[in-house]
Amino acid sequence: MAVPFRRTGKTAKRKRRTHYKLSNPALVLCKETNTFTLSHRVTKNSGYYKGKLILENKPSKAQKTTDN
Protein backbone atom coordinates (compact mmCIF):
# COMPACT_ATOMS: atom_id res chain seq x y z
CA MET A 1 0.00 0.00 0.00
CA ALA A 2 1.32 3.45 -0.92
CA VAL A 3 2.28 5.75 1.93
CA PRO A 4 3.17 9.47 1.61
CA PHE A 5 6.90 10.11 1.93
CA ARG A 6 6.36 13.29 3.97
CA ARG A 7 3.45 14.65 5.91
CA THR A 8 1.53 17.49 4.22
CA GLY A 9 1.90 20.66 6.26
CA LYS A 10 -0.93 22.94 7.39
CA THR A 11 0.00 25.72 4.98
CA ALA A 12 0.14 23.49 1.92
CA LYS A 13 -3.14 21.85 2.85
CA ARG A 14 -4.89 25.18 3.41
CA LYS A 15 -3.54 26.71 0.20
CA ARG A 16 -4.90 23.78 -1.76
CA ARG A 17 -8.32 24.09 -0.13
CA THR A 18 -8.67 27.84 -0.77
CA HIS A 19 -9.75 27.13 -4.35
CA TYR A 20 -12.91 25.28 -3.27
CA LYS A 21 -15.41 28.13 -3.22
CA LEU A 22 -18.87 28.97 -4.50
CA SER A 23 -19.49 31.49 -7.23
CA ASN A 24 -22.28 34.06 -7.13
CA PRO A 25 -25.38 33.16 -9.16
CA ALA A 26 -26.08 35.18 -12.29
CA LEU A 27 -29.13 37.25 -11.35
CA VAL A 28 -31.15 39.41 -13.74
CA LEU A 29 -33.95 41.87 -13.08
CA CYS A 30 -37.41 40.72 -14.21
CA LYS A 31 -39.05 43.49 -16.24
CA GLU A 32 -42.57 42.46 -15.22
CA THR A 33 -42.18 42.13 -11.44
CA ASN A 34 -38.94 44.09 -10.81
CA THR A 35 -37.49 41.19 -8.80
CA PHE A 36 -34.18 39.42 -9.24
CA THR A 37 -34.33 35.93 -10.77
CA LEU A 38 -31.82 33.46 -12.17
CA SER A 39 -30.83 34.12 -15.77
CA HIS A 40 -32.14 31.80 -18.51
CA ARG A 41 -35.05 30.72 -16.28
CA VAL A 42 -38.78 31.42 -16.27
CA THR A 43 -39.71 33.56 -13.28
CA LYS A 44 -41.68 31.56 -10.73
CA ASN A 45 -44.03 34.31 -9.62
CA SER A 46 -45.02 35.76 -13.01
CA GLY A 47 -44.22 33.07 -15.60
CA TYR A 48 -42.39 35.44 -17.96
CA TYR A 49 -39.20 34.69 -19.92
CA LYS A 50 -37.53 37.35 -22.08
CA GLY A 51 -40.65 39.52 -21.85
CA LYS A 52 -43.01 36.79 -23.10
CA LEU A 53 -45.62 34.94 -21.04
CA ILE A 54 -44.59 31.28 -20.94
CA LEU A 55 -46.48 29.89 -17.94
CA GLU A 56 -49.92 30.99 -16.90
CA ASN A 57 -50.48 31.16 -13.16
CA LYS A 58 -52.84 28.47 -11.92
CA PRO A 59 -54.97 29.15 -8.84
CA SER A 60 -53.72 27.25 -5.81
CA LYS A 61 -55.76 24.58 -4.02
CA ALA A 62 -56.49 26.96 -1.15
CA GLN A 63 -58.03 29.49 -3.53
CA LYS A 64 -60.12 26.79 -5.25
CA THR A 65 -61.68 25.68 -1.97
CA THR A 66 -62.56 29.23 -0.94
CA ASP A 67 -64.16 30.01 -4.32
CA ASN A 68 -66.75 27.19 -4.05
UniProtKB/Swiss-Prot annotation:
Keyword set, alphabetical order: Ribonucleoprotein, Ribosomal protein
Pfam families reported for this sequence: Ribosomal_L32p
GO MF annotation list: structural constituent of ribosome
Listed InterPro entries: Ribosomal_bL32, Ribosomal_bL32_bact, Ribosomal_zn-bd
UniProt GO BP: translation
Highest taxon above the source species: Bacteria
Entry GO terms, CC: large ribosomal subunit
NCBIfam families in alphabetical order: rpmF_bact
Protein family according to the UniProt entry: Belongs to the bacterial ribosomal protein bL32 family.
Protein name as annotated: Large ribosomal subunit protein bL32
Organism per entry: Onion yellows phytoplasma (strain OY-M)
Classification lineage: Bacteria, Bacillati, Mycoplasmatota, Mollicutes, Acholeplasmatales
Gene: rpmF
